[in-house]
Structure formats: structure tokens, C-alpha cells
Amino acid sequence: MLDIRLFRNEPDTVKSKIELRGDDPKVVDEILELDEQRRKLISATEEMKARRNKVSEEIALKKRNKENADDVIAEMRTLGDDIKEKDSQLNEIDSKMTGILCRIPNLISDDVPQGESDEDNVEVKKWGTPREFSFEPKAHWDIVEELKMADFDRAAKVSGARFVYLTNEGAQLERALMNYMITKHTTQHGYTEMMVPQLVNADTMYGTGQLPKFEEDLFKVEKEGLYTIPTAEVPLTNFYRNEIIQPGVLPEKFTGQSACFRSEAGSAGRDTRGLIRLHQFDKVEMVRFEQPEDSWNALEEMTTNAEAILEELGLPYRRVILCTGDIGFSASKTYDLEVWLPSYNDYKEISSCSNCTDFQARRANIRFKRDKAAKPELAHTLNGSGLAVGRTFAAIVENYQNEDGTVTIPEALVPFMGGKTQISKPVK
């Protein structure tokens, strides 16, 4: 959520930033109009309350002097009714303002390129060279079925489209990837490992920006009023919701693996085969809490943490900065890492790393103190995929496939695969 003072002090800046995202800047005028009404109501209510205090003193004085106080008692009742009415109007305006403010996205950083879609994202780095095959490479969905690593048909029978059973060495590879990623982030990148709740309440989803605007993208357990998480970013960021982080704690760096659940509303017809776009998938997440002056350097560091995984696995990738028309709701700036997939003859997103500045912290009331005597300030929150496990799985299977149908295990994963160096079709 944005600071109301930005609307008051820099309305034109806010309008231009909102317009860059393709949203209607008139919302700024709506907020300012409601804010003016609110301030007038507060002023009028305070005057009434001051008068009520004065009248209360007059009533007490008249009673002490055994004088008739009917007139001031009547005024007191009228003031009480009027104050109650003003408070009701104020609550209504507050509700309207919050309803509008919570749907306004974060302000985009000045160095984010302008554009309308992912076609306008700007490449800033490329690593590795896509492999030239001496044979016709197969898509990962064909490879995993031939090697008995996955079963899409039975998953469709059990759960519907966009689900998968990982079987045999497919399940082992998925587990190995998660263990490898978590181990690297905790032992080399300084993150604290967390196991997170995968069902969360509405306040938690509100804190990170999924609610109320993106409810159609979520799965909800109606009976309990809980939501399945779309990413571990949600419970990890909300760890400090409604808390003041004590001096000396920041920077705080969390990493955690979880299943992620997404309805994929609006993605009909896109990536319908394989592991790229599922309703349920595994992901290792990185979340950071930073002092405001440190968050931009933290974004660069976190992105290189994700890149280190891809480089150690030997997977060609590129880094792009998302344009104004493609960046997420809560982010001020986002880097996407895209891995090379031979079946697409293109790069596909495998990680998204964002600085959300104080946007989520304001929604979730996450503050910190620089020292014991200092006034609490809003922290900056960052999040990044480190990495999407299913897409990493797909990238390994495609990039490390062999002409005889086997798949070579990247050297970095061999210890996590029990020493296994190759995946072959099971004997039975």
C-alpha cells in the first residue's frame, strides 16, 4: 500500500507512475477528494468533542450550584448524536479510501524500462551458450514419460488438468533439487531455512498483496476461510506482520521450500503440456527484510544468489528487467531469470526477484528500529525464486538429454542423487 502523504505531496508523480502501468490515474483524484472529506470530518468532530467537554463542565457547575441544567444536558445529547454520526461518516470514508488504496500497485522505480508487455522487457545479462545437439532433442514431457519419471494421465484422472505425479527417479530428482537449492542458500548465501504453513488466512494474503485484487488466482478452502499459498513468499514475508523488528536483526534473510498453488486464471491455452505451468508445483523461495537504504543492493545480491544455482547446474540463462507493463503488483523493480529450453527454442522464466520497497511492509505493518530509542520505521521487503523447482527439473531433462534416451545428472546434483550420474529407463 502507498503512503497517503505521497498523494497529498506528489500527486502528479503518483499519477504518472500509475499511468506507466496502464492503470487509470484518476484514482489519485478520488483518493485526494476522500482525504479532504476525511480531514474536514476529523476537524469538525474534534471541535464537537471539545465543545462536549466544555458542556460537561457546565453541567457539573450548574449541578453544584443547584441550577437548572436541562438546556446544556439537551445540548450534550445533541452533541453525542452528532459525534456518533460524524464517526460513522468517518468510518465509511476510511473504508472507501482503504478499498481504493489497497488496489493501487506499488510505484515503479525510475530505472524500470517503459513497455506494455513481456515483449518489452530488457535483457541485461546472458550466461552460457545453448547446446547444439547432434540429434533431434525431445521435449521434457516426452522424456519424463519415456523414462517413467512422471505420469500426467493418472494425475489428470485424480486431480484434473495441470497436475502431475513424479515417479521413480523423477521424484528423486525433484527432491534432490530442493535439497540442493536449500543447502546452497543456507550454507553459501547466508539464508535461514524455514518450513512454512501452506494454508494462510486472508490478512496474510492481504499483507503481501494477493488480496483483494487477485483472489481469482488463488485456491480457497471455503469452510475454513483459508487460502493455499501461491508462493512461500506469502508466509515468509508475513512472519513479521504486525511486529517491530528489534535493533541488530536486519538484514533478515529467509529461504524455504513449499508447494505452490495457482489457479492460472487467464492462462488457458498457454504451456498446456509438461511441467511449465501447473496448478501445483514446488519452489524454493528467498525473502529478505532490509533497511530502506540497503534494499537496492540486496536486490542485486539476491538475484545473483538465484543465478548461482543456474550457473552451478550449467543451465544457460538470461536476466531481464521487467518493463512497466509486465511488472508485478507489489514490486517496484523486478528481474526475471529465464532458462534456455530446447523444446521452446527460447528462454522461459525460472526465477523472479523483486524489491517491494515499503509497499508490503505498510500493508502488513512490518516495522524495525535502528536502535532502542529510535522511532519504528517501515522495513523494505524483497522476494525471489531460488528457483522454481519444476522448471529447473524440465530444464535439466531437456538440456542434459542424450541420444540414447538417457539423461545425465549435473555434477552439482550427483551427491543429492545418492551418487547417481545418469537417469535411464527402469528395467521394469
Swiss-Prot record:
Keywords: Aminoacyl-tRNA synthetase, ATP-binding, Cytoplasm, Ligase, Nucleotide-binding, Protein biosynthesis. It comes from the Bacteria. GO terms for biological process: selenocysteine biosynthetic process; seryl-tRNA aminoacylation. Pathway: Aminoacyl-tRNA biosynthesis; selenocysteinyl-tRNA(Sec) biosynthesis; L-seryl-tRNA(Sec) from L-serine and tRNA(Sec): step 1/1. It holds the Pfam family Seryl_tRNA_N. NCBIfam families: serS. This is Serine--tRNA ligase. It comes from Staphylococcus aureus (strain MRSA252).
